[in-house]
């Protein structure tokens, strides 16, 4: 029995790295019956092209679904597309929910001479304890520092489409991932990364390239839980007059009293996330039972299915015959 790590998943095939080799495997039928979800980053035991066991995880995240990671690097563009603070705060809050160390990287610095944006970034996020770096994958600016934060860790790179994740990976890895320009019509990037995939930088450093996504919502938490995702709000959380204060229209709200010390854009993001969480509250009210883990249990439903027509012809013939016995066991 061999042990290895899933570095890529495509359709029903799982690509496992073990002792310097790559193995294409399928999931043993008994694991399918148990409805065990296997993620990129999972360590597994496998034999004869079949995954027999999923080993315990130290952590995992969803949207994107990745296991056994050390840190999240949030990539934003200074320009093209323009920096969106609400999108940035969304990623930060999501990483906070998963209790992961978070680094903020602002790419495409060569496209903007707006010092006010840079000053605003440092003013908001440096007091919150974030490591912040500015890069230009095109000009090589900040790449050495970017590479240094990845050393000895498994890092998930996340961010909206078009911010330059693939270009940064190309700059530090020497590989050549496909990149595309931001659309002039929409001002948004296109999805050059289609699936989560682990990329080795060296023996101890790996990055997880993830698809750009814009549909991340806080529709899996109750509104009262949202303020716990904002570090600067936590000291004032218990000082409001009302225990169930949402910090919106209530009187004697300690958090509203500190707007200014709490950045306005951060507070606006908080309000947006509370509105999204109200959808979950309505669902809980309708069902009558609060399910704390509903997000983790149902995230499979948001997975995008790969069209059967996209499969290589070999997978419709030879490989399906090879793995038929595995599926039936």
Regions found by a protein language model. Give the residues of each.
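Structural detector for short beta-strands of small beta-barrel domains
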Residues: 1-10
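Short aromatic-glycine-enriched beta-strand elements
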Residues: 12-16
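Beta-strand/loop nucleic-acid-binding surfaces
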Residues: 22-37
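Helix-rich effector regions associated with P-loop NTPase G domains
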Residues: 35-40, 47-49, 56-60, 64-65, ...
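Conserved beta-strand/loop subsegment of P-loop NTPase cores
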Residues: 70-76, 97-109, 129-135
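Histidine-anchored nucleotide/phosphate-binding helix
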Residues: 86-97
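Canonical P-loop GTPase G-domain recognition
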Residues: 111-163
């Amino acid at each position: 029995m061999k042990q290895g790590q899933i570095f890529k998943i495509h359709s029903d095939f799982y690509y496992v790295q073990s002792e310097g080799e790559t193995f294409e495997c399928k999931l043993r039928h008994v694991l399918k019956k148990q409805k065990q979800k296997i993620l990129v980053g999972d360590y597994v035991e496998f034999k004869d092209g079949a995954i027999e066991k999923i080993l315990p995880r130290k952590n995992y995240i969803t949207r994107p679904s990745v296991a056994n990671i050390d840190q999240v690097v949030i990539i934003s563009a200074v320009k093209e597309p323009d920096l969106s603070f609400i999108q940035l705060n969304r990623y930060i809050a999501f990483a906070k929910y998963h209790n992961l160390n978070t680094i903020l990287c602002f790419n495409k610095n060569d496209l903007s001479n707006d010092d006010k944006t840079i000053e605003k970034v440092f003013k908001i996020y440096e007091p919150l304890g974030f490591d912040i770096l500015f890069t230009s994958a095109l000009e090589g600016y900040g790449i050495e520092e970017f590479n240094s934060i990845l050393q000895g860790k498994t890092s998930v790179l996340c961010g909206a489409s078009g911010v330059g994740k693939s270009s940064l990976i190309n700059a530090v890895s020497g590989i050549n991932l496909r990149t595309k320009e931001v659309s002039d019509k929409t001002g948004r990037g296109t999805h050059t990364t289609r699936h989560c995939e682990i990329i080795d930088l060296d023996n101890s450093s790996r990055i997880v390239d993830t698809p750009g996504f814009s549909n991340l919502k806080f529709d899996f938490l109750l509104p009262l839980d949202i303020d716990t995702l904002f570090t600067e709000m936590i000291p004032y959380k218990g000082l409001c007059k009302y225990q169930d204060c949402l910090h919106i229209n209530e009187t004697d709200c300690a958090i509203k009293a500190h707007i200014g010390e709490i950045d306005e854009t951060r507070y606006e993001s908080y309000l947006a996330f509370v509105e999204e969480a109200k959808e979950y509250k309505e669902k809980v009210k309708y069902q009558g039972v609060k399910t704390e883990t509903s997000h983790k249990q149902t995230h499979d439903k948001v997975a995008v299915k790969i069209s059967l027509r996209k499969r290589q012809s070999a997978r419709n013939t030879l490989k399906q015959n090879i793995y038929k016995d595995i599926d039936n066991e």
